[in-house]
């Protein structure tokens, strides 16, 4: 019979510390969800869901774009509603400057954001034209970051964007993704690649770019 495998004491200590930290983090996240903490709730990336948080610089750049778009509104422009698709790390910064923001996410941890959270599953988009019907034609700005760099994911993301736009000619769209998606994206939405390059807290292997149906670069400072 093989001898039992045992870890060196220092390795075991590191492992136990890691497990303790993970347990604490999970407990904190569960508490935030239960208490509907709101925009101050913080969560770790879940790589299994292809979650990668934006850098502070990128979050602030996109927040400032939203601020400028809001400043262009007139008193008779009506409500300005914002949808964030699969980009939860943007939520806090955008929510701090505007009240009407919904975060569309598959990850139910973000129920901590209360009524601003909308659970959605891209797999339900193609088979059901009434999916999320209460949100159809409700949004003036949509910022999306599709979770996967696949043709199917881009097609479904474009479909839900089209449904959510209040007015397809006037609603603004910003989409951040890997450059590889460009032919699939531009075949489905009237967007162009911008000079603005979103960055993440952790460097990604794919070349990450942005697309928009308006001149996004004019709104980006120090691009």
Curated annotation (Swiss-Prot):
Annotated GO MF terms: nucleic acid binding; protein-lysine N-methyltransferase activity
GO cellular component terms listed in the entry, alphabetical order: cytoplasm
Cystine crosslinks: none
GO biological processes: methylation
Key words, A-Z: Cytoplasm, Methyltransferase, Transferase
EC class name: transferase
Enzyme Commission number(s) of this protein: 2.1.1.-
Protein's cellular compartments: Cytoplasm
Superkingdom of origin organism: Eukaryota
PANTHER family in the cross-refs: EEF1A LYSINE METHYLTRANSFERASE 1
Function: S-adenosyl-L-methionine-dependent protein-lysine N-methyltransferase that methylates elongation factor 1-alpha.
Record-stated family: Belongs to the class I-like SAM-binding methyltransferase superfamily. EFM5 family.
Record's protein name: Protein-lysine N-methyltransferase CG9154
Organism of derivation: Drosophila melanogaster
């Amino acid at each position: 019979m093989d001898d039992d495998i045992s870890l060196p004491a220092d390795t075991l200590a590191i492992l136990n510390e890691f497990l303790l930290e993970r347990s604490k983090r999970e407990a904190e996240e569960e508490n935030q969800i239960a208490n509907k903490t709101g925009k101050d709730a913080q969560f770790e990336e879940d790589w299994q869901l292809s979650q990668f948080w934006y850098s502070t610089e990128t979050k602030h750049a996109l927040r400032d774009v939203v601020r400028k778009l809001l400043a262009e509104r007139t008193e008779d422009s009506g409500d300005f509603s914002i949808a964030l698709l699969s980009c939860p790390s943007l939520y806090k910064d955008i929510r701090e400057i505007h009240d009407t923001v919904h975060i569309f996410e598959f990850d139910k941890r973000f129920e901590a954001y209360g009524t601003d959270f909308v659970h959605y599953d891209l797999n339900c988009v193609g088979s059901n034209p009434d999916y999320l019907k209460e949100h159809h034609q409700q949004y003036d700005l949509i910022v999306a970051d599709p979770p996967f760099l696949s043709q199917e994911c881009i097609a479904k993301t474009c479909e839900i964007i089209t449904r959510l736009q209040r007015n397809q000619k006037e609603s603004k769209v910003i989409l951040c993704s890997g450059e590889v998606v460009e032919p699939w994206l531009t075949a489905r939405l009237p967007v162009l690649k911008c000079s603005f390059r979103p960055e993440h807290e952790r460097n990604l292997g794919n070349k990450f770019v942005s697309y928009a149906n308006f001149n996004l670069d004019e709104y980006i400072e120090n691009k």
